[in-house]
UniProtKB/Swiss-Prot annotation:
Protein name in the entry: 3'-5' exonuclease DinG
Residues at which ATP binds: 284-291
UniProt keyword annotations, A-Z: ATP-binding, Cytoplasm, Exonuclease, Hydrolase, Nuclease, Nucleotide-binding
Residue intervals of the Exonuclease domain: 7-162
Organism of derivation: Bacillus subtilis (strain 168)
Family: Belongs to the helicase family. DinG subfamily. Type 2 sub-subfamily.
Effect of gene knockout: Cells are marginally sensitive to methyl methanesulfonate (MMS) and sensitive to H2O2.
Segments forming domain Helicase ATP-binding: 250-510
Keyword Cytoplasm in annotation: yes
GO MF annotation terms: 3'-5' exonuclease activity; ATP binding; DNA binding; DNA helicase activity; DNA-directed DNA polymerase activity; hydrolase activity, acting on acid anhydrides, in phosphorus-containing anhydrides
EC supergroup of this enzyme: hydrolase
Example of a GO cellular component annotation carried by this entry: cytoplasm
């Protein structure tokens, strides 16, 4: 290390391509020697061309700042000398290296033959769980100051500090991990080999505590599993006794705690439902401390009954929040340990045995190699093996499918020293008082003979407004072109490096007959060709029936009316495809018996290959069964539909089926088998009644307890609701004018001081058009415009960017109507563009309406309207999440005042402070807020 010299470079430029005439406007460097920064260099450069406005806005570097500076040629020799004999380090190396190399060459200098290190790549490897790898994100994660992002001197400084953190992290890795990283390093962008050799030599004879060996790599030494401890026999497990002595303790544990009557009411209601073996629905608004409100009675009941309580959520985010934020508070309120565990489905957990096999496969795919490197480092840190802890590249997600735990993993992955992650998670769950899971696993477990969750009769369903949807998705079926294509690609051909070629070589080595592989290859090619033709036909079929819709995503409902001559051509295609897949399965079964007979007891690498081949073939069989059910096995109590990417590939098709009334199945297969299920959410009622939700969930025959807790917030003082009088309806003006008006009102609200505006849409197509209207003006105003599905990143990343921005507008659809929290100043205004009615063309919704009609009910009153009111309440609930929050709601849909049903939406508002305003009144309000 003492002899290593690293030069960290950052450049600001007029654009992205030096070959197209873009120029450097600032260059900065920090020199690192002996583990510390020893020198700094920074120069503004005259590009001899105008700096574009957006670059000036991004960097803060203006034409005036560089007009009297020297051109790059004047500093070229100094830069050359700086880099001579050093590593070239940069954040996104190709960008900075490309510009420096080009400018040096123009100035008559050849870039020194130096090795390169990319801190984006290295950060991904050594910090595999970080949320993002931009300089600002890394600075935040590593708690480094980054005062002026997009200034070369500030960026180079923070890149240097990040690089020092990377070196230190590499130095601390155990010897086996470093050895495996060394083997992969030839595929990295960074020239890491010599550095890894140095760290390997340092660690060769060092036994670093806290790790254990699994085959060729190291894993973190697992923590001891907690054992249930017998409680004090004199302790009273009744909620009243607990409540009397713990209010003071709660106030000490929770900053800003105020006595919450609603929380205490909820505790008593949950405790009574458990004690009386009853089901219950509890509507708990923001601010009452809902999670604590059910965790305390759940912990008391689990201790008293000596059986776990299962807590199920819809989102993984809430699972983690319960375990890390709320549970520690609860644990501190008892004189004995309250144990808890998160348990997810098998596919969330890494199978160590599979990883060992895949790690040693030769792989030229960059994302796959990067993922292997990330996993090697992560295994020295993780206690759970849960993929949710990782930030994998897109190709890494495909690799994970090969590495995830499955039913065969247990018999393959047993080790003398290391328990598999999934077995460990199950063991912890079996010994816990509270088990936190998700709706999907809960429903899977109920329908399976092979139980994953511990036996329990007592459940809490949080985010219960999603429970019916989760059941519908779980009980439904789906077949896509991409799914079949991925399965076929994994098997491959005898010419490609897929499973088929490897298995033929394996059969040859073991003197087994290989003729079946040639026939299999022929039929696999037939299946690929038939699937291409079939899904292209489905795509064309849907496009012909939706010729006027200018949407990217087209949806077509399959029913008896649609089954004409063209439809019969599709069913013939589906039948042919299923017949070919069935024949493939028959050919495979002949091979399977040979494998069973001759490949048992072989080396683990051989067994792994055979297992993966069998899984892939079984995957085709399962796909065939699903396709058959979708086309030939659906019945009247299901909705079947097709979705296509109209502007995408000609076979970009997905076919779905979901039950219309999952509540009936929930009643028979879940609620009837449980002692007590408490369902809770902030939105379970319509017009103050639980009846809609009771019917939807199949609870009518169980006569559940219900409780609606009043909000602790004084909404009249904290929430202003405004309805613009001059906003015209889309029916009166048409969509183009409605889009323009929507953009105009967003711009009006953006004039407030430090605007943080969430705009909720019901259509992504409309969102895109409004974004197009806003884009130019928002860019000029300096307000950050974020749009779901347009500005890049997942909803989670958009949320984070929005939260950390001083001034921002976020345009969102479905995801942002619920389940996102923006406390305090993170959100000032929520704008609702249209009341959130489901599209009447959506097949599942249309089928539910048709079913209601057949039962003699009004589908609008019994299906569409209650669903829309619940979603509306969720959207309104984004604004005030904690005590002290204030904000404004703008509703642009005039139907809330003009339609007869508008009263239900007005009644759903938690405030009476509702005003209709002219544009001038609205402008005056915004101006007043700004002062």
């Amino acid at each position: 290390m003492n002899k290593q010299r690293f030069v960290v470079i950052d450049v600001e430029t007029t654009g992205n391509s030096p070959k197209k005439g873009d120029k450097i406007i600032q260059i900065a460097a920090v020199v690192i020697e002996n583990g510390q920064i020893t020198e700094r260099f920074s120069k503004y450069i005259n590009p001899n061309k105008s700096i574009p406005a957006f670059i000036e806005q991004l960097t803060g570097i203006s034409n005036q700042m560089v007009e009297n500076e020297q051109p790059f040629e004047a500093v070229a020799e100094e830069v050359f000398q700086l880099l001579d004999g050093a590593y070239f380090v940069a954040h996104n190396i190709h960008f900075d290296l490309g510009f420096v190399k080009y400018e040096l060459h123009k100035a008559g200098f050849q870039l020194p033959d130096c090795e390169v290190l990319d801190t984006v790549e290295l950060s991904r490897i050594v910090f595999p769980g970080f949320e993002g790898y931009k300089l600002t994100e890394l600075s935040e994660e590593l708690q480094l100051r980054h005062d002026q992002p997009h200034r070369a001197d500030s960026d180079a400084e923070v890149t240097g500090l990040i690089f020092l953190e990377i070196l230190e992290k590499l130095r601390q890795l155990p010897y086996p991990t470093l050895k495996q990283l060394r083997r992969l390093s030839q595929h990295f962008i960074s020239d890491l080999t010599h550095l890894l050799d140095m760290f390997i030599n340092e660690n060769r004879h060092t036994e670093i505590p806290g790790y254990t060996r699994f085959s060729s790599f190291s894993v973190r030494e697992p923590e001891a599993i907690d054992v249930r401890i017998n409680e004090d026999e004199n302790f009273s497990f009744e909620i009243e006794s607990w409540e009397a002595g713990n209010e003071k303790a709660l106030s000490e544990l929770m900053p800003g705690y105020e006595k919450r009557d609603g929380q205490m009411m909820m505790m008593r209601e949950v405790a009574d439902a458990f004690a009386n073996r009853e089901h219950a629905l509890i509507e708990a608004p923001p601010g009452i401390g809902k999670t604590i409100g059910y965790l305390i009675p759940a912990a008391l009941f689990a201790k008293k009954s000596k059986k776990p309580v299962i807590i199920s959520t819809y989102s993984t985010l809430l699972q983690q929040q319960i375990l890390t934020k709320d549970l520690p508070i609860v644990q501190d309120l008892f004189p004995f340990p309250v144990t808890a565990a998160i348990l997810k489905g098998q596919s969330h957990y890494l199978c160590l045995y599979k990883f060992e096999q895949v790690l040693h496969e030769e792989d030229d795919n960059y994302d796959a190699v990067l993922t292997k490197a990330q996993l090697l480092v992560w295994l020295t840190e993780t206690n759970t093996g849960d993929v949710a802890e990782l930030n994998l590249p897109s190709g890494g997600k495909l690799l994970w499918d090969r590495l995830a735990y499955d039913d065969d993993s247990y018999k393959r992955s047993r080790s003398e020293h290391v328990i598999g992650f999934y077995e460990r998670a199950k063991q912890i769950a079996m010994r816990s008082d509270l088990v936190i899971t998700n709706h999907s696993l809960l429903l899977t477990d109920e329908g399976s003979h092979k139980k994953r969750l511990p036996e329990s009769g007592t459940f809490i369903i949080d985010e219960a407004h999603h429970f019916e949807r989760a059941a519908s998705e779980h009980l439904g079926k789906r077949a896509t072109y991409i799914e079949l294509h991925t399965k076929l690609s994994r098997i491959g051909t005898l010419k490609e490096q897929g499973l088929l070629k490897k298995m033929r070589q394996l059969f040859q080595r073991n003197s087994l007959p290989v003729d079946s592989f040639f026939e299999l290859e022929e039929w696999l090619q037939h299946v690929q060709a038939e699937s291409d033709a079939f899904f292209s036909s489905v795509h064309s079929f849907v496009k012909r029936r939706k010729p006027k819709e200018d949407l990217n995503r087209l949806v077509f409902k399959v029913n008896k009316e649609s089954q004409d001559k063209s439809w019969s051509i599709l069913t013939d295609g589906a039948e042919r495809l299923c017949s070919m897949l069935t024949h493939l399965q028959q050919l495979f079964e002949a091979q399977s018996s040979l494998m069973e007979k001759h490949l048992k007891g072989m080396k683990s690498k051989t067994v792994f290959l055979a297992d993966e081949y069998q899984r892939s073939m079984k995957g085709l069989q399962h796909y065939c069964q699903t396709l058959q059910k979708l086309f030939f096995g659906s019945d009247d109590d299901e909705a079947v539909w097709i979705e296509i990417d109209a502007k995408g590939a000609k076979n970009a098709v997905a076919i779905y089926a979901q039950p219309l009334e999952p509540g009936e199945l929930l009643a028979d297969q879940f609620f009837a088998r449980k002692n007590s299920v408490v369902l809770t959410s902030a939105t379970l009622t319509v017009e103050g009644s639980f009846q809609f939700m009771i019917e939807r969930l199949g609870l009518s025959d169980f006569f559940p307890r219900t409780m609606r807790i009043e909000s602790p917030f004084s909404y009249d003082e904290r929430m202003q609701v405004m309805i613009p009088k001059e906003m015209k309806s889309i029916q009166d003006t048409g969509q183009p004018e409605f889009i323009q008006d929507t953009a105009r009102y967003i711009e009006l609200m953006a004039k407030e001081k430090q605007p943080k505006i969430l705009v909720l849409f019901t259509s992504h197509d409309m969102l895109k058009k409004v974004h197009q209207e806003l884009k130019h003006n928002m860019s000029a105003s300096g307000i950050q415009l974020l749009a779901q599905g347009i500005t890049g990143g997942s909803p989670g990343k958009l949320m984070k960017t929005f939260k950390t921005s001083n001034q921002a507008i976020l345009l969102g659809t479905n995801h942002f109507w619920e389940g996102v929290d923006f406390p305090g100043d993170e959100l000032t205004t929520v704008m609702i563009v249209r009341l959130p009615f489901r599209s009447p063309d959506h097949p599942l919704h249309a089928a539910k309406c048709e079913l209601a009609r057949k039962k003699g009910k009004n589908p609008f009153q019994t299906v569409s309207l209650p669903e829309a009111v619940l979603t509306f309440r969720q959207g309104i609930g984004r604004l005030l999440r904690s005590a002290g929050d204030k904000g404004t709601i703008i509703i642009l849909d005039r139907r809330i005042k003009t339609a007869g049903y508008g009263r239900l939406f007005l009644d759903a508002l938690p405030t009476t402070s509702v005003s209709e305003m002219t544009d001038s009144e609205l402008e005056a309000y915004v101006a007043g807020e700004k002062e």
